[in-house]
Amino acid sequence: QASSSAASDVYKRQPEGLIIQYGGQTPLKLASALESLNIPILGTSPDQIDLSEDRERFLNFVKKNNLTQPPNGMASNEKQALKVANMIGYPLVVRPSYVLGGRAMEIVYDDKDLVKYLNTAFKVNDSNPVLLDRFLDIAIEFDVEAISDGDKIVICGILQHIEQAGVHSGDSACSIPPYDISKTVIKKIKVEVNKVISNMKIVGLVNVQLAYVNDQVYLLEVNPRASRTIPFVSKALGVPLARIAAKVMAGKSLKELNFKGVPDIKRFCVKEAVMPFNKFQNVDPILGPEMRSTGEVMGIGNTFAEAFEKAEVAAGVEIPKTGCAFISVRDTDKQFLSEIITSLNQEGFKLIATKGTAGVIKDMGFKVKQIKKVLEGRPNIIDLMKNKEVNLVINTTEGRESIKDSASIRRTALDQKICCTTTIQGAKAICEVLSKKVDWSYQKLQEI
């Protein structure tokens, strides 16, 4: 168990110091307590760790160093929160400080949502202020893993999330290398990451989360520790990143370790989250900013499509190659439907959709059968799913009421083992698999 008393017991054995970067979020919260016991912390200092965890301190750091974040503001009571929300506009992501796995983070869409959040999900006060920032709805999110010795920085991996921003990084599938982003964007990401790490005086491992939209890279979070994707990146690269970082924290420089960088990846590696929803009845399997996954799997392939399909199969999801696809998407996603509908039509899928989405599909010139929503009578989409007449579900939604109204669709898909995605980027990835018609390649683990 990670606790200050347990760490103190370990220190009685007279080590040179303690490394707290390998226990996730929990040991980071012990940094100040350990420092007060005069226990040396190897690697990034407790003060810099606190800088990354304290939303208000980090916001000031961002402003001081001319870094770019989404429009945001701090609030320690309901009145302040509503004022900030009115200033930057909805939808917003509400982020408390010092939380594990995105706990109590939420996307809110109006004043009513915000007030309910502040009075139920998280008790905001002077000791527990929250950061409210503009939700970058259609942004592409990235995780960047790096090692720094306080002087030299090596970026070890840039992972592109498949689900768009707003889904917790632990729940989103991700690809290394990035699968559809330009070298120009990669360069912008590297510049931003190097700037953050050098100014924060990071020593050891660090995870930086960013988003890209409208030709702008935004800094979301910095985690001065080994993230949950370090084992995945190490496996993809064939490089023991944890071992190298431990030596750096123990005092070695990257130059002394002759660690100049990581090799180019000649294949695609996709990490997919494993969800526990089938163990919990009546839980809506929709993804959001609060982490819900309990594990992860890895797919490796010569193309992104191959790696993604392997990862889905490993996570227990079979992507149907033909059949009937049900589509119901929020208004902001309808602009992206053309590519998806074209792909499904070319693969011979029959299309069914609720009224609003069906109208958009018809306007594109495709055949589609309109189906009733659950509250509009029967037969409705739930009936078709239970009758095994649906093979693929694409369901995106926003707003508390809309999410609640469509929860039964996602739950039925899970119970009936129907392939279901709740993001438009997830739907695009599925269509990539369908259009490529990939024959799987196989390699010995020793050759990877």
Q: Where are the regions a protein language model picked out?
A:
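Active-site charged/polar residues at nucleotide-handling catalytic sites that mediate phosphoryl
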Residues: 12-13, 88, 388
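A short, GP-enriched loop/loop-strand-helix hinge that lies immediately N-terminal to
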Residues: 13-53, 68-74, 344, 415-424
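Short, ordered loop/turn segments at secondary-structure junctions
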Residues: 23, 44-49, 77, 97, ...
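A conserved helix-loop-beta module that forms one wall/lid of the active-site cleft
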Residues: 44-105, 364-371, 425-432, 437-438
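Internal nucleotide-binding/catalytic subdomain
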Residues: 88-293
